Design a protein with these regions (language model features):
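Structural motif
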Residues: 16-20, 63, 95, 128, ...
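CE4/NodB-like, metal-dependent polysaccharide N-deacetylase domain
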Residues: 45, 91-97
């Protein structure tokens, strides 16, 4: 997941990703033209490293998008949705994305003061999700290894790739 607080560290964070990772370009505060330029730059940098690049939101950001995140209807490639509550899980059950990002699994700077998702809630989500669930929010490799036993399909983060959390 990208966001504005990554600043100039975005491309260093992409270098830290394991080969074959997915990158969701968000940066919602940018104008559409700026988001398109950023998306193209991320694609040029990430694609040779074997990464998928998905756009967040309804507006097309590039000619060749590997997928869409939180976009209404269908889009090119992989479709993913955010899931912060039961209403969003019900929405995912109706729209049938290929992946859900469940968040916040742990305390995170993206949701300051927000409570982490209780393990019982995550277990219930994993049981009822129509697709694979990606854990997001305060994630590290160690936390992901523990959650793998619960059945997560993978994990995502922001700060961990900036070197601000232990991996």
């Amino acid at each position: 997941m990208t966001d504005e607080r990554m600043g100039d560290r975005l491309f260093a964070a992409i270098r830290r990703l394991p080969r074959g990772s997915g990158i969701v370009v968000r940066h919602y505060s940018l104008s559409l033209a700026e988001r398109r330029r950023l998306f193209a730059a991320v694609q040029r940098y990430a694609t040779p490293r074997g990464h998928m690049v998905l756009r967040a939101g309804p507006e097309r950001l590039g000619r060749r998008e590997d997928g869409v995140h939180n976009a209404p209807g269908t889009g090119p490639g992989l479709r993913t949705h955010a899931m912060h509550d039961w209403a969003e899980l019900r929405h995912a059950r109706r729209t049938r994305p290929e992946l859900i990002f469940a968040s916040p699994v742990h305390a995170t700077r993206s949701h300051p003061g927000g409570a982490a998702m209780p393990r019982a809630t995550l277990r219930a989500i994993l049981r009822h999700a129509p697709c694979g669930v990606i854990a997001l929010g305060g994630m590290t490799a160690r936390r992901a290894a523990h959650l793998k036993r619960l059945g997560i399909a993978g994990w995502a983060g922001i700060d961990v790739w900036l070197g601000e959390q232990p991996r």
